[in-house]
């Protein structure tokens, strides 16, 4: 990744885990961090905002070494017929990127929304 270019940070944040993947604008070169196993070992800490902040600061250091100037952020929740709101680590990760000195371009929500897809789980409610 050359000097002065931008990347795309894909933040997939559920209530069980947070995954941050950084690519260049074409989607080619990838740097990935997952909170489960890579940052914390306890399963109860995987989705916490503190863990997302740690991941984002580690990725910001890697981006600085690679010469990236800033990132566009795409936040994704589980979506589909599951939860449409991102987990607690999404905002913390964005804030940590900004505090670490990474310039932030666009922030998009790319949660998949069904166009009347499959039936959600759970029983019938009358």
From Swiss-Prot:
Gene3D superfamilies: Ribosomal protein S11
Coiled coil ranges: none
Annotated family: Belongs to the universal ribosomal protein uS11 family.
Name assigned to this protein: Small ribosomal subunit protein uS11
Family matches, as Pfam families: Ribosomal_S11
Region (Disordered): 107-126
Disulfide bonds: none
Subunit structure: Part of the 30S ribosomal subunit.
Gene designation: rps11
Any one GO CC term of the record: ribosome
Organism the protein comes from: Methanococcoides burtonii (strain DSM 6242 / NBRC 107633 / OCM 468 / ACE-M)
């Amino acid at each position: 990744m050359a000097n002065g270019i931008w990347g795309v940070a894909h933040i997939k944040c559920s209530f069980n885990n947070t995954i941050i993947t950084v690519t260049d604008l074409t989607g080619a070169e990838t740097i990935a961090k997952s909170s489960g196993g890579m940052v914390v070992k306890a399963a109860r800490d995987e989705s916490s905002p503190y863990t997302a902040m740690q991941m984002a600061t580690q990725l910001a250091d890697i981006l600085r070494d690679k010469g990236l100037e800033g990132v566009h952020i795409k936040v994704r929740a589980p979506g589909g017929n599951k939860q449409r709101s991102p987990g607690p680590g999404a905002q913390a990760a964005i804030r940590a990127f900004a505090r670490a000195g990474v310039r932030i371009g666009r922030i998009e929500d790319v949660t998949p929304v069904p166009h009347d897809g499959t039936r959600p789980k759970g029983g019938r409610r009358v």
